[in-house]
From Swiss-Prot:
GO CC field: cytoplasm; nucleus
Known tissue expression: Expressed in roots, root tips, shoot apical meristem (SAM), young leaves, flag leaves and ears.
Name the UniProt record assigns to this protein: Protein SGT1 homolog
One Pfam family here: TPR_16
Residue numbers spanned by region Disordered: 261-289, 347-367
GO molecular function: protein-folding chaperone binding
SUPFAM superfamilies xref list: HSP20-like chaperones, TPR-like
An example Gene Ontology biological process: defense response to fungus
Swiss-Prot/TrEMBL induction comment: By hydrogen peroxide.
C-alpha cells in the first residue's frame, strides 16, 4: 500500500503529466517509487511518462515490474505493448496486448494496437528480397512455368503501383515548448548522422557506407528556434528536439499550406544581415534563400475558414500579458481543448471543467 508521501508525489506527478511536463512527471514517479517500491500503479504510470519522452526501453522495464507486482493490471500490459511497438518488437507487443486484453475485454485500445501489430508483422513477412538469377543457378522447374502462366492469365496488363516506403519510420509528439521527432534508425553510428536546423526547415541525413542513404528534409509545421534545437543519436533511434518559436500544438510535422498558413513579421535588413550561422559537417545550405521563399509564399496566401480562426487565436496569445497566457493554457489543457479563457482571476483558483460541443461526449483521460 502506498504511503502518504508516495500518494502526495503520485498526485503531483499526475498533475505534471496533464501539464505535458513528462520529465517532471517521471522524476516525481521515481521519488514515489522510492517511498513505496511495491506499488504496481506507480511503475505503470511512470511507464506512460517514459513513452511520452521516447524512452521506450525504460517504459518496457517499468511495465514488466508493474506486471510482476500485479499480474492482472491490464494497463501495465497496454503500456508494454505500446512501448514494444515503438521499438518495433511487434511479436512481443502482440503477446502482451493479448494477455492484457483478457483482463479488459471490450477496451478498444487493445484491439486497435493488436491490429497495428498484425499489420506490422504482415509487412515484415512480405518484405522478402528478390535477387536476380546468377550464372550456374538451377533452372526454374516446369511447375513454376505453369504457375507463372496461370498467374499471368489472371492479371491485368496494367503494371501494379508500388509504394516506395522510406528507409526509416519516424514519429513525433508535442510538449509545451518542443516537438520531439524520433527517427527509428537502429545501430547507426553518430558520425554518419547530420542534422541541420533552419527557421522553418529541417534537414536529416544518414549516410552509412555500403547502405542506401537516407534524407529527410521537411518544411516544418511552424517556426522553430534553431540555436535551441538539438539532437541525439541513440542505439535504436535518432531523437531530434525542435524548440518551438510559438507555444502552439503542432497537428502535423509538415507545413500544411491551407489550414495553417500564418503571415510572419518581416525581419529588418539589419537584423537579417546579423543572422547567425549554424555549424554542420554537410555542405553549407542557403537557409536565407529558403526562408525568403517561405515568407514570400506566406505573404501571398489568403486566409479563410480555419486558417483565419487560427490566426485570430495566435494574435490573442501573442498580444496577451502573462496572466492571460496562463489562463489560456490552463483552461485549454484542463478542459481537454473545449474551453479557452483569458481571465486568470476566473480560472486560476479552480479546475476548468470540459464543455464539449452539442452532440459530443467528453471522455476522461486514464493515466
Amino acid at each position: 500500500m502506498a504511503t502518504a508521501a508516495a500518494s502526495d508525489l503520485e498526485s503531483k506527478a499526475k498533475a505534471a503529466f496533464v501539464d505535458d511536463d513528462f520529465e517532471l512527471a517521471a522524476e516525481l514517479y521515481t521519488q514515489a517509487i522510492e517511498a513505496s517500491p511495491a506499488t504496481a500503479e506507480l511503475y505503470a504510470d511512470r511507464a506512460q511518462a517514459h513513452i511520452k519522452l521516447g524512452n521506450y526501453t525504460e517504459a518496457v522495464a517499468d511495465a514488466n515490474k508493474a506486471i510482476e507486482l500485479d499480474p492482472s493490471m491490464h494497463k501495465a500490459y497496454l503500456r508494454k505493448g505500446a512501448a514494444c511497438i515503438r521499438l518495433e518488437e511487434y511479436q512481443t507487443a502482440k503477446a502482451a496486448l493479448e494477455l492484457g486484453y483478457s483482463f479488459a475485454s471490450g477496451d478498444s485500445r487493445f484491439t486497435r494496437l493488436m491490429k497495428e501489430c498484425d499489420e506490422r508483422i504482415a509487412e515484415e513477412l512480405s518484405e522478402v528480397p528478390v535477387k536476380k538469377a546468377e550464372d550456374g543457378a538451377a533452372a526454374p522447374s516446369v511447375a513454376s512455368f505453369v504457375e507463372e502462366k496461370d498467374d499471368a492469365a489472371n492479371m491485368d496488363n496494367t503494371p501494379p503501383m508500388v509504394e516506395v516506403k522510406p528507409k526509416y519510420r519516424h514519429d513525433f509528439y508535442n510538449s509545451a515548448t518542443e516537438v520531439v521527432l524520433t527517427i527509428f534508425a537502429k545501430g547507426v553510428p553518430a558520425e554518419n548522422v547530420v542534422v541541420d536546423f533552419g527557421e522553418q526547415m529541417l534537414s536529416v541525413s544518414i549516410e552509412v557506407p555500403g547502405e542506401e542513404p537516407y534524407h529527410f528534409q521537411p518544411r516544418l509545421f511552424s517556426k522553430i528556434i534553431p540555436e535551441k534545437s538539438r539532437y541525439q543519436v541513440l542505439s535504436t533511434k535518432v531523437e531530434i528536439r525542435l524548440a518551438k518559436a510559438e507555444q502552439i500544438t503542432w497537428t502535423s510535422l509538415d507545413y500544411d499550406k491551407k489550414p495553417k498558413a500564418v503571415p510572419q513579421k518581416i525581419i529588418p535588413p539589419a537584423e537579417s544581415a546579423q543572422r547567425p550561422s549554424y555549424p554542420s559537417s554537410k555542405s553549407k545550405k542557403d537557409w536565407d534563400k529558403l526562408e525568403a521563399e517561405v515568407k514570400k509564399e506566406e505573404k501571398e496566401e489568403k486566409l479563410e475558414g480555419d486558417a483565419a480562426l487560427n490566426k485570430f487565436f495566435r494574435d490573442i496569445y501573442s498580444d496577451a500579458d502573462e496572466d492571460m497566457r496562463r489562463a489560456m493554457m490552463k483552461s485549454f489543457v484542463e478542459s481537454n481543448g473545449t474551453v479557452l479563457s483569458t481571465n486568470w482571476k476566473d480560472v486560476g483558483s479552480k479546475k476548468v471543467e470540459g464543455s464539449p460541443p452539442d452532440g459530443m461526449e467528453l471522455k476522461k483521460w486514464e493515466y
